UniProtKB/Swiss-Prot annotation:
Transmembrane segments: none annotated. Belongs to the AB hydrolase superfamily. MetX family. It comes from Methanosphaera stadtmanae (strain ATCC 43021 / DSM 3091 / JCM 11832 / MCB-3). GO terms for molecular function: homoserine O-acetyltransferase activity. This is Homoserine O-acetyltransferase. Residues 48-354 form the AB hydrolase-1 domain. InterPro entries: AB_hydrolase_1, AB_hydrolase_fold, CBS_dom, CBS_dom_sf, HAT_MetX-like. PROSITE patterns: CBS. Its EC number is 2.3.1.31.
């Protein structure tokens, strides 16, 4: 079957760590497994990687179709050919979070120490633990930098944690409908949901796996409560109003009468068939514990952040309000972080980031299109001292397979550049020193220049690369057409 603007059939992969994972609580999780999917092609420079982080009950299946699917991955409106997370340009990775039940190790999996499901023997995990597990996956895939990390809701928390825990890895970050910490109201909603599960007689202290039962009633109620927080009053009015379900007058009893009641019951019932109750307990607890401030100011907590960031709130989201997200924006700006802020106009509430493809497409595409040199450049480059002789330059080019080398002075400032053509000229003119043949008016760029500007400069001067310099004219890297071709060529 062909799916327009879709990836077609995809499959989930699994990575079992060879080492144990140290958790924030001090506990150890023995060689966990990470479920993940990838879309698109990794370029030679490995500079086009985007990590997508899912929300509370999501999974690694973010886009495309699995055999037998009735609908595609949960963010198929955003990921795929020609979409904001364009698989013709980017290599997309999405992994299931630690503690879930969708392929990554969680409480429903077998504890190697007992050969029984973990249940409540599974250790408490945090958002940072999820991020550390994702980092282990990237290490396994030999990926050292992320062009971007993107996520909404709990996925947005992971995005923010990435920029703090691994600031040198992340070039761009997109945080949608999320927060820097869980509010008392959010914790309260989670507490009531967990209580509904724990009070279900079939929960059995978390050991229901061995009993062949499941706390479906408690999990269903928990999902119903959560779903209310994902919607807005406006969307409920538009979708349901006060319309009755399969009747035209009140029954004056305690049966299901309103359409909105029936809808919530359906959401709760179907959810119990595809999610584990203990995983729900652990993941909502991870939400509660999330707090980047850790007894300091938000501004101070965000000091490590180096990436360019897009913060996106939703006008009708009362779970993660725009005030909460604007607090993050102000703290980042106080730290001189390059931050963009957009408000998604929608009546769909918190879940709008999974629905509003039009606005989402524009905002995300616009942000990612403003890539800078530092997003794709090589941070290691060969240089040659200006006192070196022509033979040294020729040997360096030949041994390292380079066609041009920046020339630097004693202070490592760039003073020229020598190319393979210059070496040919040296032979023809019988030149004796690099100073005789090097180009002294060197074309350069900075790490903050836009890629569009660099591309124009390369085309105008018919060159394939530029040295990247800092404010003191010291060479800090290089950028070539190979670095950027996968982002700008179809």
């Amino acid at each position: 079957m062909t799916y327009k603007k879709s990836l077609g059939n995809v499959s989930t992969k699994y990575y079992k760590m060879k080492e144990d994972l140290q958790l924030d609580t001090g506990n150890i999780l023995e060689t966990p497994t990470i479920a993940y999917e990838t879309y698109g092609k990794l370029n030679n420079e490995k500079s086009n990687v985007i990590l997508v982080c899912h929300a509370l009950t999501g999974d690694a299946h973010a886009a495309g179709w699995h055999d037998g699917d009735k609908k595609p991955g949960w963010w198929n409106i955003i990921i795929g050919p020609g979409k904001p997370l364009d698989t013709n340009r980017y290599f997309i990775i999405c992994s299931n979070v630690l503690g879930s039940c969708k392929g990554t190790t969680g409480p429903c999996d077998i504890n190697p120490k007992t050969n029984k499901p973990y249940g409540l023997d599974f250790p408490i995990i945090t958002i940072n633990d999820m991020v550390k597990a994702q980092k282990k996956l990237l290490d396994y895939l030999d990926i050292n930098h992320l062009y971007a990390v993107v996520g909404g809701s709990m996925g947005g928390m992971q995005v923010l944690q990435w920029t703090i825990t691994y600031p040198d890895m992340v070039r761009n970050a997109i945080m949608i409908a999320s927060g820097a910490y869980s509010t008392p109201q959010q914790i309260a909603f989670n507490a009531v949901q967990r209580r509904s599960i724990i009070e279900d007689p079939n929960w059995k202290g978390g050991k229901y796996y061995e009993e062949g039962v499941s706390p479906e009633q408690g999990l269903s109620v928990a999902r119903m409560i959560a779903h209310i927080t994902y919607l807005s009053n406006e969307s409920m009015y538009e979708k349901f109003g006060r319309k009755l379900q399969d009747k035209n007058k009140f029954s004056y009893d305690f049966s299901t009468e309103f359409q909105v009641e029936s809808y919530l019951e359906h959401q709760g019932s179907t959810f119990t068939k595809k999610f584990d109750a203990n995983s729900y307990l652990y993941l909502t607890k991870a939400l509660d514990y999330f707090e980047v401030r850790k007894n300091t100011s938000l501004e101070e907590a965000l000091k490590p952040v180096k990436s360019r960031i897009l913060i996106m709130s939703i006008t009708s989201d009362w779970l993660y309000t725009h005030e909460h997200m604007e607090e993050i924006v102000m703290a980042l700006r106080a730290n001189n972080v390059e931050v963009s802020y957009s408000r998604l106009n929608s009546e769909y509430g918190h879940d709008a980031f999974l629905i509003e493809n039009g606005q989402m497409n524009y905002i995300i595409s616009n942000f990612l299109s403003k890539a800078r040199v530092k997003d794709v450049m090589s941070h290691t480059t060969l240089t040659l001292d200006y006192t070196a002789d022509i033979k040294e330059a020729a040997e360096l080019m030949m041994n390292c397979n380079k066609t041009h080398i920046p020339i630097v002075d004693d202070g490592k400032e760039i003073v020229g550049i020598i190319t393979a053509w210059d070496l040919s000229k040296a032979i023809a003119t019988d030149a004796n020193s690099i100073d005789d043949i090097m180009t002294k008016n060197v074309l350069t760029c900075t790490e903050y220049d836009s890629l569009h500007k660099v591309i124009r400069k390369m085309k105008e001067h018919n060159i394939s690369g530029l040295p990247v310099i800092d404010k003191n004219h010291k060479v800090i890297g290089s950028i070539t057409t190979a670095h950027i071709s996968n982002l700008y060529e179809k």
